[in-house]
Amino acid sequence: MSEVLNVVPVIPLRDVVIYPSMTLPLNVGRKKSIEAVKQASNSYNNYILLATQKNGSSSGDVVDNIYDIGTLAKVVQIMKLPDGSLKIIVEGIAKRLVAKYESIDGCIYANLDSLHIDDNYDPSQIDKELKAILLSITDSLKKFVDISGKVSKESLATLINTEEPHKFIYEISTILNTEIAKKQKILEATDIKNKALLLLSCLYEELEILELEAKIKDRVKSQVDKNQREYYLNEQVKAIYKELGEADEESEVTALKSRIEATKMSKEAKEKCLKELKKLKAMPPSSSESAVSRNYIETILSLPWGKKAKVKKDINLAEKVLEKDHYGIKKVKERILEHLAVQIKRDTNAKAPILCLVGPPGVGKTSIGQSIARATGREYVRMALGGVRDESEIRGHRRTYIGSMPGQIIQKIIKSKTENPLFLLDEIDKISSDFRGDPSAALLEVLDPEQNSTFNDHYLEIDYDLSKVMFVATANSLDIDPALRDRLEIIHLSGYTEIEKQAIAKQYLVPKALENNGLTKNEINFTPKATLDIIRYYTREAGVRNLQQKIDGVCRKAVKNLLKDPEHGKVSITQNNLEDYLGVHQFDYGIKNAKPKVGQVTGLAWTSVGGELLTIEALAMPGKGKVKYTGSLGDVMKESIDAAFSVVRSISKDYKLEDDFYEKKDIHIHVPEGATPKDGPSAGIAMTTALVSVYTNKPVRNDIAMTGEVTLRGDVLAIGGLKEKLLAALRGGIKEVLIPKQNVKNLADVDKEILEKLEITPVNSIKEVLERVF
């Protein structure tokens, strides 16, 4: 090399060391390395430094991760690949010491040290000791090639005949799987003896590993041969036993027979198992039929024959568990306690009705089932019936089908490991049927106390007693097959009121959210008004599932703020900062009218998510007595308007109206929020009041709301959903509520807090209503 180079571009190498005198191809993909090749070609007469990275997997600064000694090489050929990378052929020239690496304009450069460290071949250096080391290397290399087979005989002969020791050492180092750090030490070594000893050490390590691998392979091969020999001998023994007509008392069959005899299964089940075991003996162990028989016997043995959980008979404990786990729903808890009390009082084998908890989503139907299990000490198993269409999900598949298995009922019983678990049939109203059968028909036998003592699963083909199981079903609606519904005792769970939701949030939801998000009471606090605003403005549901999600959302944001600002202190969630956590209000609720108006009446409506104020508007215009009603009204509500007209005409003289008053004006009745369908008879008295107000031109009090159905005789009939309607009235700022006198008995279900803040006026007739509203 005639040129004297002080600075050259650098290609950092990963997991490879390139030695002088080597010519080999390299794939170049990194941007800095591609730039180094370009600079070498354009400005450095194709000279480049090939230096190895200390850590090939590091993604940090490459400049600080390169060895100080590398190989100066010349780029012989450059090829561009389609993906933008390069393939180059380099020829190693000499090893050089680097004084400093620098990264300039996307390329790494090496400032070469003036110290000359080239490996020059001097025959006088080869003494007896070096010759002995080189001979040991040659012998070890031959062993290495014999075991690994990495190098052909021709290449080995060429390698052994290499005269120059440096080149000989470098060539051998290249074919070894030695660590990169050790290969780098071989490059850096200046003394030829040290270089040779380093290589010999690497060779010995490689030989030791290869010999160990060979021993392991031999051991595995001998074990496989032994297993094959044992299998062959076992098959011969079986054939001899078969020829002699003697039973092959295999350990597995013997163990199965012992288990069958020891299990307290029914007589029918034991006979079936022994019959199947006899068939299993005559089958080859490797046949698919033997696997089917074995699985069948194991399934029957895994059933909890005679194993029962000790049922707790403490009704006070059951009451405490239900009170602790669920707020409110007093009637539901009372009915469940009555059911448990009867079971405790009567014989445990007595047939009990099947409970079915019906209510909207999120009111706690499934968790009530879990609480009953805890209160009674039974194991809890749950089967989700939503979307089940196949009868085999309940009864199982017959064994003639490949991959057959028991139905979910039997599988869950096996999982519970007891004969008397609490079995929750979740979402029983979501069952549907198709060409594969009707699952609800299969459930008839399961849920009938008169029949489930002999439940027959298609897979088992034997009767299994389910009478000890306590079944509880849940549903969102009563849209259940009539025959199936007839076997259930329905318990209705209504939606929670705002007051109940506030209490549930305080006692259950907020503590749960704090625990789930790693918070403590000292780090965050929800004010009662903030909780109420979450209920009113961010959720609209009968249950509390969305409320839990919103509270979780607030907690997550609070955790983020606390981590970003540890000095922030305790987070307090109030009405004023709630929008910072949950955004703008998502829902609104009805409030009373700003002032009394003619023809505008506040009614009360019940929805699946609670009560609502229902504004009813009536407008009179000159005309010929036509009536128009808008607001997505249902047939029942339209008929209620017609009835109201008749009532108004019948009492017209009381308000000094002319006989033909209704023929001179057209009436338009509208119920706002026209996109929302509305129906039902409970707005009858409100409709009548609106019409009287229009015809007499008298404004209706804005602080009064009413609910009740009206008859043609002017009588006021009872309505439903009174509790929810009164809460909506209180929330909307109403002072007085007119209710049917027949509904006075329902006030016992209403919270005292609501009754104390509202003036409840029972009415019998429309005349009593009209006396209060003007």
Curated annotation (Swiss-Prot):
Belongs to the peptidase S16 family. It comes from Francisella philomiragia subsp. philomiragia (strain ATCC 25017 / CCUG 19701 / FSC 153 / O#319-036). Residues 8-207 form the Lon N-terminal domain. Induction: By heat shock. Keywords: ATP-binding, Cytoplasm, Hydrolase, Nucleotide-binding, Protease, Serine protease, Stress response. It catalyses: Hydrolysis of proteins in presence of ATP. Its EC number is 3.4.21.53. ATP-dependent serine protease that mediates the selective degradation of mutant and abnormal proteins as well as certain short-lived regulatory proteins. Required for cellular homeostasis and for survival from DNA damage and developmental changes induced by stress. Degrades polypeptides processively to yield small peptide fragments that are 5 to 10 amino acids long. Binds to DNA in a double-stranded, site-specific manner. GO terms for biological process: cellular response to heat; protein quality control for misfolded or incompletely synthesized proteins. It is found in: Cytoplasm. GO terms for cellular component: cytoplasm. GO terms for molecular function: ATP binding; ATP hydrolysis activity; ATP-dependent peptidase activity; sequence-specific DNA binding; serine-type endopeptidase activity. PANTHER family: ATP DEPENDENT LON PROTEASE FAMILY MEMBER. It comes from the Bacteria. Gene3D superfamilies: 1.10.8.60, 1.20.5.5270, 1.20.58.1480, 3.30.230.10, LON domain-like (2.30.130.40), P-loop containing nucleotide triphosphate hydrolases (3.40.50.300). SMART domains: AAA, LON. This is Lon protease. ATP binds at G359, P360, P361, G362, V363, G364, K365, T366. The active site is at S682, K725. Residues 595-774 form the Lon proteolytic domain.
